[in-house]
């Protein structure tokens, strides 16, 4: 049994997470006793339909329970260190359609909780806990995630803000179980990326490759996608979050395959996400221009990865990626001027407009990054993580170079900025579209662990497409 499989054979560490959240509350001024209260996502019906909407568990609830059941509740009593899960009781009317639900005994075996009760017991339990916490005790819950029939009236104090913040901040640093979940999602995602590479030669439409990806993920245990797959062929790859996924892989004007396909797609394993991007030649061989850009982006990532360890300032890593892009585009003649002047004028933002990466966990764009979307410096405006990276965090490293007319043409029309871009040389690169390479990185005290195993070098990608 592998290390990942061995870790995942155990229970999700819900109680450890509850204790971590309480410690955060204590560090931020909370004293005394109290109760944490959270609700699972409710069963919801499709509007004008008798079918249920696809279910996605609330991440705050899962973090303190490890439970994927809808319509559940939990309480954590701080002073007694007791975590209780409340699950829906058996509904005889639904058994003939859906089978028997999980029993309290079964739930107790599955989840890292001290007690499992039915949801009909939640208000009596809250009333009892209110009597236990004393005259200055708190109940912590999340505004907007409290059912109308839930009563906190017996608690001296109610806080609907602090718990959400505490969980968001605690989620940044992952424990071994969480890292194993992300690694598992990455392992399945890598198999799906390989399946797409192998299907490329015979496919005629983006949707065929999307189907190959999703089918492989489901077959290997990731029934949900971490996000809507991006399967962008040709110049559509210059659109950062292209989602149509239904264009032909043939350029109808030349009757030849488009140059490249950008595949940004990943599976989700029991709420934990991967987030992986690869860009590869649809013909099985990079064009000279595509290979030049691919090599620049790969170097952007390689130089960024070399900087990673506990305490590194993420803004510094982001700037390093821009410096590599500038140097590479200067060498190709696309940019003109000095490296420092191009950096100062933020010219590289025209080709690399997004941030270098984001935290990853139960959400693809995970919590705790403290982005500043109002930043007046356009190089940092879309940087989703600001500040130093702690050991235990998981972050994406996803540099890219894009030839997007919507973004670049305003630079070409600007009398001041246009002098830094050679439009004649640029003309050769529009068909490249966009190149992005994205891996998922676990930060350690001395360095990092790359959780992503999908083929990445240009030679590997070409060999895989060509059946080697």
UniProtKB/Swiss-Prot annotation:
Family classification: Belongs to the peptidase M24B family.
Binding site for Mn(2+) 2: 264, 275, 438
Cofactor note: Binds 2 manganese ions per subunit.
Gene Ontology MF term list: manganese ion binding; metalloaminopeptidase activity
Pfam families: AMP_N, Peptidase_M24
Keyword terms of this UniProt record: Aminopeptidase, Hydrolase, Manganese, Metal-binding, Metalloprotease, Protease
Lineage: Eukaryota, Fungi, Dikarya, Ascomycota, Pezizomycotina
Biological processes, Gene Ontology terms: proteolysis
InterPro entries with a match to the protein in the record: Aminopep_P_N (IPR007865), Creatin/AminoP/Spt16_N (IPR029149), Creatinase/aminopeptidase-like (IPR036005), Pept_M24 (IPR000994), X-Pro_dipept-like (IPR052433)
EC number, as in UniProt: 3.4.11.9
CDD domains recorded: Prolidase (cd01087)
Full protein name: Probable Xaa-Pro aminopeptidase pepP
Annotated catalysed reactions: Release of any N-terminal amino acid, including proline, that is linked to proline, even from a dipeptide or tripeptide
Function: Catalyzes the removal of a penultimate prolyl residue from the N-termini of peptides.
Cofactor: Mn(2+)
Positions that bind Mn(2+) 1: 275, 398, 438
């Amino acid at each position: 049994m592998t290390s990942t499989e061995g870790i995942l054979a155990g229970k999700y560490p819900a109680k450890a997470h509850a204790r971590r959240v309480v410690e955060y509350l204590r560090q931020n001024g909370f004293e005394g006793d109290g109760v944490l209260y959270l609700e699972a996502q409710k069963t919801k019906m499709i509007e004008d339909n008798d079918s249920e909407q696809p279910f996605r568990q609330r991440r705050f609830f899962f973090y303190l329970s490890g439970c994927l059941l809808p319509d559940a509740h939990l309480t954590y009593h701080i002073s007694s260190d007791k975590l209780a899960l409340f699950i829906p009781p058996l509904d005889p009317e639904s058994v003939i359609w859906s089978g028997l639900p999980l029993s309290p005994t079964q739930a107790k075996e599955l989840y890292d909780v001290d007690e499992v009760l039915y949801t009909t017991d939640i208000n009596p339990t809250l009333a009892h806990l209110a009597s236990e916490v004393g005259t200055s005790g708190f109940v912590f819950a999340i505004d907007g995630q409290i059912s109308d029939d839930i009563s906190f009236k017996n608690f001296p104090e109610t806080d609907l803000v602090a718990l959400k913040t505490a969980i968001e901040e605690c989620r940044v640093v992952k424990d071994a179980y969480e890292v194993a979940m992300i690694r598992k999602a990455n392992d399945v995602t890598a198999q799906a990326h390989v399946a797409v590479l192998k299907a490329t030669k015979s496919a005629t439409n983006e949707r065929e490759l999307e189907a190959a990806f999703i089918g492989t993920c489901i077959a290997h245990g990731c029934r949900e996608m971490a996000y809507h797959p991006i399967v962008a062929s040709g110049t559509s790859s210059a659109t950062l979050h292209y989602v149509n996924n239904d264009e032909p892989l043939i350029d109808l004007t030349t009757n030849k395959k488009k140059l490249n396909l950008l595949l940004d797609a990943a599976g989700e394993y029991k709420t934990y996400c991967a987030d992986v991007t690869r860009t590869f030649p649809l013909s099985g061989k990079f064009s000279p221009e595509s290979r030049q850009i691919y090599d620049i982006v790969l170097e952007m990532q390689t130089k960024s990865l070399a900087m990673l360890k506990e305490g590194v300032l993420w803004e510094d890593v982001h700037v390093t990626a821009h410096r590599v892009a500038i140097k590479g585009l200067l060498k190709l003649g696309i940019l003109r001027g000095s490296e420092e002047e191009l950096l100062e004028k933020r010219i590289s933002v025209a080709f690399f407009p997004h941030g270098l990466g984001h935290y990853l966990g139960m959400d693809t764009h995970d919590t705790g990054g403290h982005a500043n979307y109002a930043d007046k410096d356009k190089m940092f405006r879309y940087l989703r993580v600001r500040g130093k990276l702690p050991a235990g965090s998981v972050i994406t490293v996803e540099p890219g170079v894009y030839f997007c007319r919507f973004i670049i043409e305003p630079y070409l029309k600007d009398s001041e900025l246009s002098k830094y871009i050679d439009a004649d040389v640029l003309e050769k690169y529009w068909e490249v579209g966009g190149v992005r390479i994205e891996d998922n990185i676990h930060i350690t005290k001395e360095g990092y662990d790359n959780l992503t195993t999908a083929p990445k070098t240009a030679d590997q990608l070409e060999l895989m497409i060509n059946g080697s």
